[in-house]
Amino acid sequence: MVSLLSCGTSASSHIVKKALTRLSLAMAAGLCFNLAAQEPTPPIITPTSPSVTIPLQTYADEQAIVKSANNLNTETKVRFAKTANFDSDTVVKIARKLAQKPYVELKDPLPPGLAKISYDEYRDIRFKPEASIWKAEGLPYQMQLFHRGFYFQDLIEIALVEGKQASHLAYNSEFFTAGDVLSQRLPTQDIGYSGLRIHYPLNNPAYFDELMVFQGASYFRALGKGSDYGLSSRGLALNTAEPEGEEFPIFRAFWVERPNTDSNLIVVHALLDSPSVAGAYRFSVRPGENTHIDVEATLFPRVDLVKVGLAPSTSMFLHSMNGRQNTDDFRPEVHDSDALLILNGRGERLWRPLANPKQLQVSAFMDNSPQGFGLIQRERSFDAYQDLEAHYERRPSLWVEPVGNWGAGEVVLTEIPTDSEIHDNIVSYWKPKQPIAAGSEFHFTYRLIWGSEPEVDDGTVIVARTASGRAEIAKATPRRLFVIDYQVKEGNNDEIPVAKVQSSAGVVTNVVVSRQPKTNGYRLAFEMDPQDAELIELRAELKFTGPRDVETWLYRWTL
């Protein structure tokens, strides 16, 4: 069973149910999960440090209790997030050592009663807000933990870091409440956790909102001010949409640095592992209108990583005004993201609306040293969605800014057919041109921006809306009508541009550009006759007499 991301107990039931019941992307694509059972082998790292259950006290008290645990006789075996010295290279050293040995599938079975609990029973296990880490100290952040159970079977280790010292955070049943639905007691032994979430007064200085969640494989997600949980990021993507099946690395352990009282920065370190690669990650999180997360990662491949995706994002697209064939839904649009935006190495802005295709499809956009890319939720009007529970207009965009020169490669977009909004079916990532060699150390850095999409300069012309339908109302026809509305950002639209529309097949006719007063921009309309083609790549550009920053519209039409 693939671990899936939970958005926490405080989110709406709609969002929680989607997160807990979403299928893996490989399964949604009709692929197999590529982690075959292996023969038991000795553990990679011999555990030496004991762990301890930490009662609900101040951090200073927690430190004293952890130190006193050295004399305790405990059966808990801490593999990674041990009570030990800690510095900026600690996780890198652990990942390097891990990669030097064959992968071992860790087996940490839950007690039988917890291993097979239902969705409703899992939801009945809640973290006590009063037990939040650092709550008693009045720090700008608090941390809560996720219990294991249901889809979340993997044991995740967590350590708290203060200065040069890491202290293992053992499982404590007193951190949780279990209601009448669960009808069983929580275990007393250290079973670990399934993830963590960071809280911060993002929207109200008097309330600690959920800010960021790590749970399920290498999935994580965050919020900007005023947004709701939507799309997710991952530590790494491997073999996405490949016939042999996708491989899902997992964050095995986290080290969370104690935040300072006078800073809005919190730092989380993570250890990644899978059959193909081990890795060390450092997340520097700064919340705000847009939440910025600086990611520093070092990969240690066990095998050549050929089909690897860096900075992957995972989202959902069910339908929009661009193609609602066979859609019986009162809501005009249903999606967490409506397009892929790319700012390539040449400075060209590419806008590629998403699709829910009949068959799995993969698009690749070749580039050299991209400036940024991401899955964007540009439509912010409630009227576009009409969903009082899901509120898709509040879902964040996720923009990826590479730091340094990422060289040659391609932005890859994978679109998977789905018939339900609870299934994530969109993936984007950067694929380097050259494989990452086995035995090497591959370091890369990037920034994730959660919230609004990147600001553009005044006068920039961006795509505001894409719609399509049959070209004739009175009778059926294979010809398609495309209507693209553009918006001028804080500028005038005195000049009517000339449109250049290209297609890889078929015939494009009746190209018309007019003013669109509702967007302070333009409307481009054209017809496309596919003729015998089953797949057509479309490209539309607006040409002005002088220099102007204009988004290039791209789309893949399929029969």
From Swiss-Prot:
Keywords: Periplasm, Signal. One of its GO terms (cellular component) is outer membrane-bounded periplasmic space. GO terms for molecular function: carbohydrate binding; catalytic activity. Residues 1-37 form the signal peptide. Pfam families: MdoG. Its main location: periplasm. Pathway: Glycan metabolism; osmoregulated periplasmic glucan (OPG) biosynthesis. It comes from the Bacteria. GO terms for biological process: beta-glucan biosynthetic process. It is found in: Periplasm. Involved in the biosynthesis of osmoregulated periplasmic glucans (OPGs). Belongs to the OpgD/OpgG family. HAMAP family: MdoG_OpgG. This is Glucans biosynthesis protein G. It comes from Shewanella frigidimarina (strain NCIMB 400). The gene is opgG.
